[in-house]
Amino acid sequence: MKPIMKKMTASLIASTIVFMLVSCASKDSADEYDFSYDYRDDEYEFINDEAPESTEDFLADIDPVDLAPVYFLKKKGKKVSPREVTKIALIPRTNAVEFHFRDGANEVAVIWRKAERDKILNACKKFLQQYEDKTVPHVKISKKNAYFSSKCSLWFGLISTSNGCENNSYYVVPEFIEKKPYLLIRFSPTQTTSGQDTYTPKISLYMSPQQVRDFIEQMNQEKLEESIKENKKKAYTY
């Protein structure tokens, strides 16, 4: 049997070496971090420097925010009736606005990115100017006579919006109903991405001049960004 004192001495030497190595490692690790408690009280509640910059396709890395309802009209024969769209959300991660509503038997979701909203707002402003000048053109409802035509994401389904496409054709055009001008957003049937021979439904959203004014105000980019200001502050404030 080996002497106990030799075992203790060897253990003591080994422990001392380990302690010295750990101490050195701890010092090296601490030196890797740049930290300081030298800050002023008035530096609280500032936006973290690491918060991502807003762009045309990105506002913040936060969840969707519900927006106030938007009012359109639906047409039956020569009569129009209100169509209230209450499920509207701003998607900060893509700077898109989603509109969810029922059209006939279908639940429908229309998604407009900022570039599309800008086109629609420009058409709205042109329509209002023509309305005020009493120069709204009396034209046949068609893509050819539209203020503009483009594509957007549109999804639909009887229960959920599981069918549709990212490039649904639509256009914006004036239409007279009972001798009064309205602004029409017409979604044309477009083949879906489901792989089947199915098409999106034909959908018409009408707006009176006052509803056009309200739509312009609600879809104003500054107002949309204001709606997430408090959430963004909570998400990124130090």
List where the protein language model places each region.
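Positively charged, low-complexity terminal tracts
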Residues: 25-238
